[in-house]
Amino acid sequence: MATSAIQQSSFAGQTALKPSSDLIQKVGVLGGGRVTMRRTVKSTPQSIWYGPDRPKYLGPFSENTPSYLTGEYPGDYGWDTAGLSADPETFAKNRELEVIHSRWAMLGALGCTFPEILSKNGVKFGEAVWFKAGSQIFSEGGLDYLGNPNLIHAQSILAIWAVQVVLMGFIEGYRIGGGPLGEGLDPLYPGGAFDPLNLAEDPEAFSELKVKELKNGRLAMFSMFGFFVQAIVTGKGPIENLFDHLADPVANNAWSYATNFVPGK
């Protein structure tokens, strides 16, 4: 009787000491009854931005999403009216292009606004408006990077064009051709030296960051489009347009500028 109790106690203790990550089923007999001990695996919480229950582009009013948009990838809100992602190869290519253009747009939006912000706060480094800055190369003194002649000084638009084509063409050609430098790395999220802050160490946090990057990137692409339209319509930079709107919202807004192009006005 005592031996049986010791064996049962030892069996229960060994089971309790098993790691919580293991899925274990032990069966024993106690007092003529059948006892099953089971330890289940703790499920990993999933991000709300992925899977079939993720937010859709029209919220609860969204229609049935296409079967190929399963929520597997970041930024998938189930919207593809034109069917651009129906082909898997095209879908993969479009995902890559969107991430790359998002990153360029975020850098571009910063470059379009930051010089104006500095200029408004008394920092002088030449032309602050983004679409006017390049024209300084045609001036007598040429173009100084950040207004400092000791950094990069340029006076030839042809030289700038040639350097841009050669450098960017080489880099893009290398990327598209799949050079050996990036072997073994994810083409969109290489990590390592490209993640010095180790932001992608936690997989769950990394999946959230992918979504945030695309959301901000899409907003930046729309912003860049708006900056181009503003430059054509008003001839001013985005910060100056913002200041004008805040000073007189009625006279300076998209509607008032659009009506200037009405025939007969």
From Swiss-Prot:
Where on this chain does chlorophyll a 1 bind? 79, 85, 98, 218
Residues holding chlorophyll b 1: 57
| Topology of this chain in the membrane | Multi-pass membrane protein
Induction / repression: Accumulates at stronger levels in low light than in normal or high light; more expressed in growth chamber conditions than when grown in the field. Repressed in leaves exposed to desiccation, cold and high irradiance via a metalloprotease-dependent proteolytic process (at protein level).
**Gene Ontology cellular-component terms listed:** chloroplast; chloroplast envelope; chloroplast thylakoid; chloroplast thylakoid membrane; mitochondrion; photosystem I; photosystem II; plant-type vacuole
UniProt transit peptide range: 1-37
Deleted gene: phenotype: In plants silenced with microRNAs, functional LHCII thylakoid protein complexes where LHCB2 is replaced by LHCB1. However these LHCII complexes are impaired in light state transitions, leading to stunted growth in high light. Reduced reactive oxygen species (ROS) production in leaves and impaired stomatal closure in response to abscisic acid (ABA). Increased water loss and reduced resistance to drought, probably due to open stomata. Altered expression of other LHCB members.
- Residues binding chlorophyll b 4 are 164, 175
Question: Which parts of the sequence bind chlorophyll b 2?
Answer: 103, 152, 181
Instruction: Mention one GO molecular function.
Output: metal ion binding
Which keywords are on file for this protein?
Chlorophyll, Chloroplast, Chromophore, Magnesium, Membrane, Metal-binding, Phosphoprotein, Photosynthesis, Photosystem I, Photosystem II, Plastid, Thylakoid, Transit peptide, Transmembrane, Transmembrane helix
**For chlorophyll a 6, which residues are the binding ones?**
245, 254
Q: Which residues bind chlorophyll b 5?
A: 164, 261
As for PTM, the annotation reads: Photoregulated by reversible but rapid phosphorylation by STN7 of its threonine residues under state 2 (red) light conditions. Dephosphorylated by PPH1 in state 1 (far red) light conditions. Phosphorylation triggers the formation of the PSI-LHCII supercomplex.
User: Where, by residue number, does chlorophyll b 3 bind?
Assistant: 156, 172
Tell me the InterPro entries matching this sequence: Chloro_AB-bd_pln (IPR001344), Chloroa_b-bind (IPR022796)
* Positions that bind chlorophyll a 4: 216
Its localization reads:
Plastid, Chloroplast thylakoid membrane
Q: Which Gene3D superfamilies match?
A: Chlorophyll a/b binding protein domain
**Does the record's keyword annotation contain Chloroplast?**
yes
Q: What does this protein do?
A: The light-harvesting complex (LHC) functions as a light receptor, it captures and delivers excitation energy to photosystems with which it is closely associated. Mediates rapid phosphorylation and migration of LHCII-PSII to photosystem I (PSI) after transition to state 2 (red) light conditions, thus leading to the formation of PSI-PSII-LHCII and PSI-LHCII supercomplex to balance the relative excitation of PSI and PSII. Involved in the production of reactive oxygen species (ROS) and stomatal closure upon abscisic acid (ABA) treatment. Required to prevent water loss.
What is the name listed in the Swiss-Prot or TrEMBL entry for this protein?
A: Chlorophyll a-b binding protein 2.2, chloroplastic
Q: Which gene encodes it?
A: LHCB2.2
